[in-house]
Amino acid sequence: MEALGFLKLEVNGPMVTVALSVALLALLKWYSTSAFSRLEKLGLRHPKPSPFIGNLMFFRQGFWESQMELRKLYGPLCGYYLGRRMFIVISEPDMIKQVLVENFSNFTNRMASGLEFKSVADSVLFLRDKRWEEVRGALMSAFSPEKLNEMTPLISQACDLLLAHLKRYAESGDAFDIQRCYRNYTTDVVASVAFGTPVDSQQAPEDPFVKHCKRFFEFCIPRPILVLLLSFPSIMVPLARILPNKNRDELNGFFNKLIRNVIALRDQQAAEERRRDFLQMVLDARHSASPVGVQDFDMVGDVFSSTRCKPNPSRQHQAGPMARPLTVDEIVGQAFIFLIAGYEIVTNTLSFATYLLATNPDCQEKLLREVDLFKEKHMVPEFCSLEEGLPYLDMVIAETLRMYPPAFRFTREAAQDCEVLGQRIPAGAVLEMAVGALHHDPEHWPSPETFNPERFTAEAQQQHRPFTYLPFGAGPRSCLGVRLGLLEVKLTLLHVLHKFQFQACPETQVPLQLESKSALGPKNGVYIKIVSR
């Protein structure tokens, strides 16, 4: 009996601890790899994942380089794991068409991590299902040619500050980082056009708006926290949402308060006194339901059509009242997306275009002649004259976006199990469109690393295979602000090249090193010299 008692104590003590530890380790080992059989079951090739973090280390060199490597090693349809989440990567045009257009009803939503800032989560970029459709429909009118024409003078005013700053570099003859100048300029445009708050980032870097913008784009998740989020998403993501975060809360509070104050001021003003900026266009549209259906949401298709500055007859219907008007949080969200697109996408597009023109002087000379002729006819450019009167500038921008698409990857989620061109797609799967790999595929773009604006003559574009050029996406959920983004890029290059010429110099990095943590951009800036004309 004493022996049995002794045995009982042993079982209840250290042996239980050891047994539980072994069971826990076995459970963790199973959990660490349990999500990593799904791609294989779908017949999709992929890099070998590491326990818990999946293929996170595959992307340590940057998403751009890794996207090219995925395409090279595993083909136009492959996959990877980021933590436990599975991604199906597509760079095959016909399948992309099926996802973005033909089967859009099953791929309506973008992937959301659950960690987005409140302002970002309430934007049209991340809204989902019916609410996305309602808000996108209401905002369509804010991007009409008529409304963009009203915003053109505001962009030109911000550009005047940029020109004054560039003049000092032209007078000094020094090499400088023009990307930093563009970043200050796009901050000024965003503040003025989207937030109704004119600033001068170059002269007033301590302005609260400028400081909070800088804080937002410097925000990043520490690597150990990122590993935990990827490894245990069902626990860590909800926890991260509810735990206090001073930086996040201060940024949300600042931009929310700023918009609320502007709304309160404008509600007290007569209609003719209100500033005609993007924020006002959103406020004007906040109660209006879309007069069109999802099938007419494709802004990118309109922009690249031959009638891009003419009214679309399908949209010439009177909008009715919106069942649930845009909330203040949603209005802040739209301004916030303007901030992200303006600060990153427009800045980087301008930087890349400047680099390509500086290193391709023959193309720059041709563009300068077009700019001079245009300026002779249009001293004060309007939206439609910019749309139709600068064909070579259009070609330069299009080729810049082919070579260096800032938005080089975007996602869709499968709502239900389906089959796309013979490939089974399970519900909840995240599909990633590999725009960078598509734009550098020699099958579609011969000599893809060569800058050649002639790829985008009217005749050449007729020969392009559909869905091989996607700098703004495609289909009903393509970029809503494509017109405004291109307007800002074109207007800026027009004003700058009318006054200055870009020159490569010993400090110019050739080829450019790239950074791709989020949007694609130059890693070390774009150093050039400029000469007054």
Swiss-Prot record:
Residues 1-10, 97-223, 357-533 are cytoplasmic. It holds the Pfam family p450. Its EC number is 5.3.99.5, 4.2.1.152. GO terms for biological process: icosanoid metabolic process; prostaglandin biosynthetic process. Heme binds at residue 479. Residues 32-75, 245-335 are lumenal. GO terms for molecular function: 12-hydroxyheptadecatrienoic acid synthase activity; heme binding; hydroperoxy icosatetraenoate dehydratase activity; iron ion binding; oxidoreductase activity, acting on paired donors, with incorporation or reduction of molecular oxygen; steroid hydroxylase activity; thromboxane-A synthase activity. SUPFAM superfamilies: Cytochrome P450. Keywords: Endoplasmic reticulum, Fatty acid biosynthesis, Fatty acid metabolism, Heme, Iron, Isomerase, Lipid biosynthesis, Lipid metabolism, Lyase, Membrane, Metal-binding, Monooxygenase, Oxidoreductase, Prostaglandin biosynthesis, Prostaglandin metabolism, Transmembrane, Transmembrane helix. Its cofactor is heme. The chain crosses the membrane at residues 11-31, 76-96, 224-244, 336-356. It catalyses: prostaglandin H2 = thromboxane A2; prostaglandin H2 = (12S)-hydroxy-(5Z,8E,10E)-heptadecatrienoate + malonaldehyde; a hydroperoxyeicosatetraenoate = an oxoeicosatetraenoate + H2O; (15S)-hydroperoxy-(5Z,8Z,11Z,13E)-eicosatetraenoate = 15-oxo-(5Z,8Z,11Z,13E)-eicosatetraenoate + H2O. It is found in: Endoplasmic reticulum membrane. It is a multi-pass membrane protein. The keyword Cell membrane does not apply. Catalyzes the conversion of prostaglandin H2 (PGH2) to thromboxane A2 (TXA2), a potent inducer of blood vessel constriction and platelet aggregation. Also cleaves PGH2 to 12-hydroxy-heptadecatrienoicacid (12-HHT) and malondialdehyde, which is known to act as a mediator of DNA damage. 12-HHT and malondialdehyde are formed stoichiometrically in the same amounts as TXA2. Additionally, displays dehydratase activity, toward (15S)-hydroperoxy-(5Z,8Z,11Z,13E)-eicosatetraenoate (15(S)-HPETE) producing 15-KETE and 15-HETE. Belongs to the cytochrome P450 family. Monomer. This is Thromboxane-A synthase.
